[in-house]
Amino acid sequence: MTFGPQPNSLTPLINNQICKKKVAIHAQGLNLILGGKTLLDNFDIDINAGEVTALLGPNGAGKSSLLKVLCGEIEATGSIEFFGQNRKQWSAKALAKHLGVLPQHSTLNFAFLAHEVVELGGLPLELSNIQTQQITQEKMALVDVCDLSHRLYPSLSGGEKQRVHFARILTQVSQAGDQCVLMLDEPTSALDLAHQHRTLQVAKELASNGAAVIIVLHDLNLAAQYADRLVIVNHGLIQADGTPWQALQPDIIERVYGWPVYISSHPTGDFPVILSH
């Protein structure tokens, strides 16, 4: 599917054929106004299981607010279903086993060791200590934080803390089965190049195993490389929704971000590369 002629206004460009998979989250008619600013404006979205969905858009577009509304951190008008059931009908305990949320900033001032922070993710699972430790070690290895295991959490760098919390939420949803949702708000913002790619590779692998993964990203090239679906948001509205090739059109990007770009093809992969003018 290709988009038709591009309008001059910020009319949403939406690929309505994209949602053919199992729907993990169905949100309809979301409205959110904070401080007099409309962050979500009659916002509808379905998030599919088995996909990485990247939320893109400029600062203040409503991306992080959408994640907070979907997970219940912020209340908004409208309806939200998780796997066909109203989110409010899920108990907190059940939701904790199936939904992992990585916020932009995680505050923890206690002098826990890094592995103890990761083990906190096992609290909802009601597993034995040995089982929890085994899962914890597996997830720490997955995101490359085993060497931080006995470091005090407050002594870690921002990127190290981010990876420790990623291991924690991976532990938390490790028993979710085929009803798993991960919401990652700028998970690569404090990471070096190698760990940016490692984090997104893990997200991609989880989606390939059936999880619904929603990621807020600012790096358009990382989104193009790892996401199955891109949803570009601005002014609380969806501006484009489709595959990387469909959504990352030069005129869309210039309208939304206010900056001209070139779109090229990656020399070794089937995804676009965005170059600034």
From Swiss-Prot:
Main location group: membrane
Lipid bilayer topology: Peripheral membrane protein
InterPro entries to which the protein is assigned, alphabetical: AAA+_ATPase (IPR003593), ABC_transporter-like_ATP-bd (IPR003439), P-loop_NTPase (IPR027417)
Protein's cellular compartments: Cell inner membrane
UniProtKB keywords: ATP-binding, Cell inner membrane, Cell membrane, Membrane, Nucleotide-binding, Translocase, Transport
Domain of life: Bacteria
Gene Ontology MF terms in the entry: ATP binding; ATP hydrolysis activity
SMART domains xref list: AAA
Pfam families linked to this entry: ABC_tran (PF00005)
GO annotation, cellular component aspect: plasma membrane
EC number(s) given by UniProt: 7.6.2.-
ABC transporter domain sequence ranges: 25-260
NCBIfam families listed in its UniProt record: PRK13548.1
The protein's role, per its UniProt record: Part of the ABC transporter complex HmuTUV involved in hemin import. Responsible for energy coupling to the transport system.
Similarity comment: family membership: Belongs to the ABC transporter superfamily. Heme (hemin) importer (TC 3.A.1.14.5) family.
UniProt name for this protein: Hemin import ATP-binding protein HmuV
Organism per entry: Photobacterium profundum (strain SS9)
Name of the gene encoding the protein in the UniProt record: hmuV
